[in-house]
Amino acid sequence: MLLSTQSIPIKKSVDDIWPVAGKRVLIRVDFNVPTSSGGIDDDFRIRSAIPTIRRIVDQGGICILISHLGRPTGVDYDTAHAEQEKRQTPVQLPNSRGKTAFFSGLRGDAKATILAWSSQREKAATLSNPYGSGKTAVFARLPEEEKRRLLLRFMSEHKEELFPQLGSAGYEKEFSLEPVAVKLAELLDQHVYFGHDCLGAQADIAKLRCGEVMLLENLRFYTNENSSDERKRMLMARILASYADVYINDAFGTAHRDSASLTGIPRVLQQGAAGYLMEKEISYFSKVLNNPPRPLLAIIGGAKLSDKMQVLENLLDCVDSLFIGGGLAYTFLRSQGYSIGTSHFEEAFVPFAQALPLAGSGRQVRVVLPEDHVCHAHTRPAEAPLTTTSANIPDGYAGLDIGPLTIQSITHLVRQCSSVIWNGPLGMFEMPYYAFGTFSIARVVSQSSAAKGTTSIVGGGDTASAMMKSGEAAHISHISTGGNASLELLEGKVLAAVAVLDNKE
């Protein structure tokens, strides 16, 4: 019973690309972290990227990080570039007074840079103090053509400094990665530079020295990142690739996507390696899906059956037992004639839910459903919920968590097996009344891993968050950073961003 993950060749990793000293190493990370009020709510994904970043820094590489955050509206690069061209018109000022006024608004160090290019002897005395006075007066006395030449040169070589507003194409404050840069600096215990425009960072990157780190602004501020138009994606990929001597993908959470930063850059550079996190993710999933210690139990929860159908079908070819919980269980219970009250179910998939347990039986896979429920007439109750004594849910009530009988059954399954895959919470764990089931199973899986070495993989953003909140994460073999990426692996698919990386020789 094997899945197609077995066919993934072993990829080059961080340790296969030495030496990196003095090289610009572009690392695609997954810093798509939950935020609120400008703060980081959960830094798990940031911490997961530290080993790769630290290795490059310690070896003297120049570390350039790129990521997305959330779903900003974004702008097209060509549109943004055209707007930038319009904003450059101030250098075409018609008279000396206009050019001088423009010069007077620049910073002291920028003025010093411009005057240093001048052929006029009298400007030299003003350069001893880059923040001193007198530079504007010197500039005002320069010949008109000299002023024009100097401003055009500064415009060309210091575009980001001259027009800082050009670095905000597509900018939305709530999706900015700048707070992530602050958190990363804290975790690395070193300064992290921030590039305000991911497609206009050439000048900033050129200033970086060996061992330094820069995080660029949100890739999705440009719609090119995930554009359906390959030409637009590759335009962005070529710009990003121009920053790099070496490309590393350490963003497992987005490895299922065909986007500029994930598949485009390695195609442009014709090289790419897996970061330590990516390598670890692929290794664990490949092991547990293709050659796991047996018996193997899969616990699949979540809200909708339609999101997990292919996963469930594929797992029948690899697991020994399959527990189906969370919101998707109610369609299965409905298909078997149980009363589910007002619990959400998907009528269109009732035939699938009827057929899956039979298919499992034919493959010697035990398919297990909830035996009882914690439920309520409202999804946000002020009083204690009702716990049923059977799989039936009373009219007017909705199931929001598994009950004690179900917890006992899953506990028995976990203690019997040698490997566990868990994807999807088993209840509305964000609310205290409905967290007990999910947290109880987290405790059982953790204890089994600690006591008898059970291989345990927890995948999916909500499941990883639940595991962290339960306080039981320490003994889990692997908590995946991937949501849809881990689902696609469970479905037996090869991830697009992994396929384009170099195979290990």
UniProtKB/Swiss-Prot annotation:
GO molecular function: ADP binding; ATP binding; metal ion binding; phosphoglycerate kinase activity
GO terms under cellular component: cytosol; glycosome
Positions contributing to AMP binding: 303-304, 308, 327, 399, 430
Cell compartments where the protein resides: Glycosome
Keywords: ATP-binding, Glycolysis, Glycosome, Kinase, Magnesium, Metal-binding, Nucleotide-binding, Peroxisome, Transferase
Cofactor(s) listed: Mg(2+)
CDD domains per record: Phosphoglycerate_kinase
Cited SUPFAM superfamilies: Phosphoglycerate kinase
Residues the record lists as binding Mg(2+): 303, 307, 462
Family of the protein in this entry: Belongs to the phosphoglycerate kinase family.
HAMAP family xref list: Phosphoglyc_kinase
Name the record gives this protein: Phosphoglycerate kinase, glycosomal
Organism of derivation: Crithidia fasciculata
